[in-house]
């Protein structure tokens, strides 16, 4: 069942609505401003239900949301060196919003700052959102139509399907930037998360947090999550990569990528005190693991104050800076070649 309610008004004057999708042992709240995930309620072992998604109570707080809580990021997620992408021999320039580089396309006018059009699909318990960009808008070519379909299935799986069609060759890498704390969004560091990643390689970064181009083995590094291990010790490891990012802010290269055709489990997360678990699936080649290294004391929902490490984000996407790295899986989108990225969240308790 889907419910809808007025949540407020965007700066442009457009009404913003909040949508609630219910399923077995899960309740998901989203909004059409930024195609944003607002909250996910799931039970622990004894049946205590908590919201495990970081965010705000009020719509107005999302207007200034540098952490991008819950947001749909695009058209290009993560970092792009020099804020420039070359497509078909032409250089296209995005805003240089992190030094000389670009982060998340445009932090002021990106997809997470728009009110998306909405169509409800009661039959499939889904909310379909669409928005568009004109040729050259946000610094990239093509008249582009973006879609985000949020579904809660009959088995309680939360599914996001991102898509884009363009009338010209362009580059797209969308993701969702939801932060999780499986002990409860306001648990802070009073939690114990253990991770497994289906990733034998990761992408080292340079002093500007841009991938160096190397696809490095995880063995012998803090990025080796091939077997269940706690994430907290790695966040403070005596490792130059960890120190550079103040924790994890690196792309894990998920095994078994087949150019977006296969949905596979990328990550498994367990919170030991509550027994909540998350299986994270995607069709994307990589998952940016970000451990909230730059979270400040945002005044958040339920009067929580988030700080360093208060939550983690799993960002399924193309590898960061792919247009400049010929060894990375490429993803040019154009006529007859649409973009797709499917993400699934399977919550459990054991």
Segments predicted by a language model, with ranges:
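An exposed, glycine/acidic-rich loop-and-rim segment of catalytic or binding clefts
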Residues: 1-350
């Amino acid at each position: 069942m889907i419910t809808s309610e007025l949540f407020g008004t965007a700066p442009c004057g457009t009404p913003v609505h909040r949508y609630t999708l219910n399923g077995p042992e899960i309740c998901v709240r989203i909004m059409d401003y930024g195609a944003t995930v607002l909250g996910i309620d799931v039970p622990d072992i004894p049946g205590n239900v908590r919201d495990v998604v970081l965010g705000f109570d009020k719509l107005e707080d999302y207007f200034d949301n540098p952490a991008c809580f819950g947001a749909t990021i695009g058209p290009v997620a993560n970092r792009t060196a020099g804020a420039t992408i070359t497509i078909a021999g032409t250089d296209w320039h995005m805003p240089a919003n992190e030094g000389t580089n670009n982060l998340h396309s445009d932090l002021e006018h990106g997809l997470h700052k728009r009110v998306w059009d909405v169509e409800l699909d009661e039959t499939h318990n889904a909310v379909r959102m669409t928005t568009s960009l004109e040729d050259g808008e946000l610094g990239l070519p093509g008249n582009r139509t973006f879609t985000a379909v949020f579904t809660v299935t009959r088995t309680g799986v939360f599914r996001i399907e991102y898509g884009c069609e363009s009338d010209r060759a362009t580059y797209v890498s969308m993701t969702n930037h939801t932060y999780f704390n499986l002990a409860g969004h306001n648990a802070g560091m009073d939690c114990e998360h253990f991770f497994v990643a289906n990733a034998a390689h990761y992408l080292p970064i340079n002093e500007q947090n841009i991938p160096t181009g190397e696809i490095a083995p995880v063995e012998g590094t803090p990025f080796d999550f091939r077997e269940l291990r706690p994430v907290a010790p790695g966040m403070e490891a005596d490792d130059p990569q960890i120190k550079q990012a103040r924790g994890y802010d690196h792309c894990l290269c998920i095994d078994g990528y087949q150019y977006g055709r296969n949905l596979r489990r990328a990550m498994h997360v367990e919170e030991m005190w509550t027994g909540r678990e998350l299986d994270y699936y995607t069709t994307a080649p990589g998952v940016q693991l970000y451990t909230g290294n730059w979270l400040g004391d945002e005044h958040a929902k339920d009067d929580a104050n988030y700080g360093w490490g208060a939550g983690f984000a799993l960002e399924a996407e193309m590898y960061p800076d792919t247009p400049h790295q010929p060894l990375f899986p490429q993803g040019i989108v154009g006529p007859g070649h649409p973009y797709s990225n499917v993400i699934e969240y399977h919550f459990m308790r054991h």
